[in-house]
Amino acid sequence: MSGAGEALAPGPVGPQRVAEAGGGQLGSTAQGKCDKDNTEKDITQATNSHFTHGEMQDQSIWGNPSDGELIRTQPQRLPQLQTSAQVPSGEEIGKIKNGHTGLSNGNGIHHGAKHGSADNRKLSAPVSQKMHRKIQSSLSVNSDISKKSKVNAVFSQKTGSSPEDCCVHCILACLFCEFLTLCNIVLGQASCGICTSEACCCCCGDEMGDDCNCPCDMDCGIMDACCESSDCLEICMECCGICFPS
């Protein structure tokens, strides 16, 4: 009976059995709640990591402001990489072949200034003509200045009196048989010192005495004969033309 009683030991009866059944249900409920909490925790961590990554990107775009400063700039969009190269159209190739150049923006729209070789030639021709005219004008001005300086130098040399001019006047006076004029010039300049006033009076006076020691022994008749000849006059005219070309 004892063995049968042990084998057939009845379980808890009544409230104790109900409590054990209730304890099993509570354990399963607690385990489900724990699993739910773990799932929500994983979702929260993933969301926080996503937000942290986004904030880091925004911070790289906005910059790194120091604490206490307000952000006053707008975020900029990251540049998009262009994977496809722009292929020029037929019109653009024709413009490039014709010598037209242009500038293009990011959208491929060309804003070009058309400058060909013909335009360059047209612009260079007036510039070269202007430079040539300036050079010619400067050369003409320089030549005029040099001519004026030469004329002034010659004029200053002619206007100045020198002993050579006196000698020329004396020679011309002799050739034109102006003996008195010659004597006056000699007396005025006193360049030779040979003929004096007394000697000239002695030589040219009406009365010529034997006691007159005249160093310039001249015959007035020879002078008169010289004045009458045409050869002497021609020589005088040639001398005048050489000495006084004006």
Curated annotation (Swiss-Prot):
Residues 74-246 form the MDFI domain. Palmitoylated. The modification Phosphoserine is found at residues 128, 140, 143. GO terms for molecular function: cyclin binding; DNA-binding transcription factor binding; Tat protein binding. GO terms for cellular component: cytoplasm; extracellular region; nucleolus; nucleus; plasma membrane. GO terms for biological process: negative regulation of DNA-templated transcription; negative regulation of protein import into nucleus; positive regulation of DNA-templated transcription; positive regulation of viral transcription; regulation of JNK cascade; regulation of Wnt signaling pathway. Residues 44-63 have a biased composition (Polar residues). Residues 33-43 have a biased composition (Basic and acidic residues). InterPro entries: MDFI/MDFIC. Changing residue 244 to L: In LMPHM12; uncertain significance. The cysteine-rich C-terminus is involved in its granular distribution in the cytoplasm. The cysteine-rich C-terminus mediates protein-protein interactions, including interaction with HIV-1 Tat, transcription factors, AXIN1, CCNT1. It is linked to Lymphatic malformation 12: A form of primary lymphedema, a disease characterized by swelling of body parts due to developmental anomalies and functional defects of the lymphatic system. Patients with lymphedema may suffer from recurrent local infections. LMPHM12 is an autosomal recessive, severe form often resulting in fetal or perinatal demise. It is characterized by dysfunction of core collecting lymphatic vessels, including the thoracic duct and cisterna chyli, non-immune hydrops fetalis, chylothorax, pleural effusions, and chylous ascites. Interacts with HAND1; the interaction sequesters HAND1 into the nucleolus and inhibits its activity. Interacts (via C-terminus) with ZIC2. Interacts (via C-terminus) with AXIN1, the histidine-rich region of CCNT1/cyclin-T and weakly with LEF1. Interacts with CCNT2. Interacts with GATA2. Interacts (via C-terminus) with Piezo channel composed of PIEZO1 or PIEZO2; the interaction prolongs Piezo channel inactivation. (Microbial infection) Interacts (via C-terminus) with HIV-1 Tat and Rev. This is MyoD family inhibitor domain-containing protein. It comes from Homo sapiens. The gene is MDFIC.
